[in-house]
């Protein structure tokens, strides 16, 4: 069992809208996964929700705007802020500055690891299919 996960050894996934550097794969955990999100100026993932996941973000660097709910209520975020996204909550976060927005994202699976997507790669394949993104172009294994 692993207890320490160096952030210098991550798997990089470059989506069309953002980067996820996987630190702890859900396959290596019972109820969570951890990644570092990097958004360039103006970048934001699509508004989305997770039915089985509560998310916690810790803002490391940059400035951003968190959008919550169908009405997209806006909240500014900056380094040191902690964000909590309950399950089934529409959300997105956009880089609002001239420098990248970086934050640690912790996914907490309230009912345990999702059986249909037991690894981060399996989740990425589903996400790519939903968004019309090419999985092979998203996956970048080196930082």
Report each predicted region and the residues it spans.
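A short, N-terminal "cap"/entry segment at the start of jelly-roll beta-barrel domains
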Residues: 1-33, 46, 114, 118-143
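A generic "binding-loop/recognition-motif" signal
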Residues: 19, 43, 52-53, 71, ...
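Short, charged/polar surface micro-motifs in flexible loops or helix N-caps
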Residues: 28-31, 39-43, 63-65, 72, ...
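Conserved short histidine dyad/triad with adjacent acidic residue
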Residues: 35-51
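Residue-level recognition of conserved beta-strand positions in structured domain cores
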Residues: 36, 49, 60, 68-70, ...
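A short beta-strand-loop-beta hairpin characteristic of the jelly-roll/cupin
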Residues: 54-79, 89
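Ligand-binding loop in jelly-roll beta-barrel domains
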Residues: 78-79, 87-114
């Amino acid at each position: 069992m692993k207890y320490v996960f160096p952030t210098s050894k991550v798997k990089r996934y470059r989506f069309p809208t953002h980067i996820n550097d996987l630190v702890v794969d859900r396959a290596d955990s019972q109820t969570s996964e951890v990644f570092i999100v990097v958004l360039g100026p103006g970048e934001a993932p699509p508004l989305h929700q997770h039915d089985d996941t509560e998310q916690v973000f810790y803002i490391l660097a940059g400035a951003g705007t968190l959008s919550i709910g169908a009405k997209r209520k806006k909240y500014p975020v900056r380094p040191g802020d902690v964000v909590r996204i309950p399950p089934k909550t529409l959300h997105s976060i956009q880089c609002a500055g001239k420098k990248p927005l970086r934050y640690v994202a912790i996914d907490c699976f309230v009912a345990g690891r999702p059986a249909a997507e037991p690894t981060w790669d399996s989740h990425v394949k589903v996400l790519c299919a939903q968004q019309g993104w090419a999985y092979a172009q998203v996956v970048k294994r080196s930082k």
